[in-house]
Design a protein with these regions (language model features):
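Short, flexible helix/strand-to-coil boundary loops that buttress conserved ligand/catalytic motifs
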Residues: 39, 102, 114
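Structure-specific DNA junction-binding interface
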Residues: 1-77
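Residue-level recognition of specific faces of alpha-helices
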Residues: 1, 71-77, 86-89, 101, ...
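Amphipathic, charged-and-aliphatic alpha-helical interface segments
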Residues: 51, 58-63, 83-102, 123-126
Length: 126
């Protein structure tokens, strides 16, 4: 398990970043909410990570706080939501907005995320 990556931010792309740590450049998928608040390239960052291992793929997903990482992991526990779907939800809704929508039962707000229909939004709330 890789709990976090700390190093120099060397690249930003549409849905991922690269952090140079030691002698490695580590690619990490991140939601838009993270991309929007990252420091400029060349600055140090600390990204809390979730390592997703599949038969043919290993991917890191990253967040600025442990609580946002935990929200991502809770979304992974919802039937029908994989890591890319969870990342899409957290890109469409800031983690605090998603928490509020879940607490108030606002399925309409959750279903605004791409690929999330009414049934999936209800499963997230439950």
């Amino acid at each position: 398990m890789i709990s976090y990556v700390k190093g120099i931010l060397v690249e930003k792309a549409k849905d991922r970043i690269v952090v140079e740590s030691g002698m490695m450049g580590i690619g990490i998928f991140v939601p838009m909410s993270v991309l929007e608040v990252l420091p400029p390239l060349g600055e140090e960052v600390k990204i809390y990570t979730h390592l997703q291992v599949r038969e043919d793929d290993m991917s890191l997903y990253g967040f600025l706080s442990r609580s946002d990482l935990e929200m991502f992991r809770q979304l992974l526990g919802v039937n029908g939501i994989g890591p890319k779907g969870a990342l899409g939800i957290l890109s469409a809704l800031r983690p605090e907005d998603l928490r509020l929508a879940v607490m108030t039962g606002d399925a309409k707000a959750i279903s605004r995320a791409p690929g999330v229909g009414a049934k999936t939004a209800q499963r997230i709330i439950l």
